[in-house]
Amino acid sequence: EVGLRLFGALCKHIKRQRISVEGSVRLISDINLYSDFVGSLRQKPLGPYFRALRELGQIYLVRIDAPAASYFGGGVKKGSRMAAKGASSTTMAMQAKELAVIIADTRRYGGVFTVEEVLGFAERRADWFAVRGEVERGMYGVGCLVM
């Protein structure tokens, strides 16, 4: 019971925080320490919960480089802004697709978290508002054509 309460408290705490890529390293480190503590309790049923929590930390670790030209146009000519936006948005789309794959992989979380729950955690990324559209496009396949 103590382990499940700790798991619930950690999940609740993570959902309250905005977590950056740099903060994800600390989060993963802390989760590993909690996981080691729970392992020392020798309660095997708790293992999958904390393994899923360790995997969950990976969604904050994926760096997505938002295109600067779309936010700040200072000093960039119109023609070059479009070229820069196209090149960086391709990179951003690939990075967002990588994050979408991590979010949608249900086997990764061992049935502890559903895709919707993982998406709820992903919404706590510090850059979520900038990358939300690309991640959802990668997850749900918006813009796909069926031939």
PLM regions and their residue ranges:
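Extended alpha-helical "rod" scaffolds
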Residues: 1-147
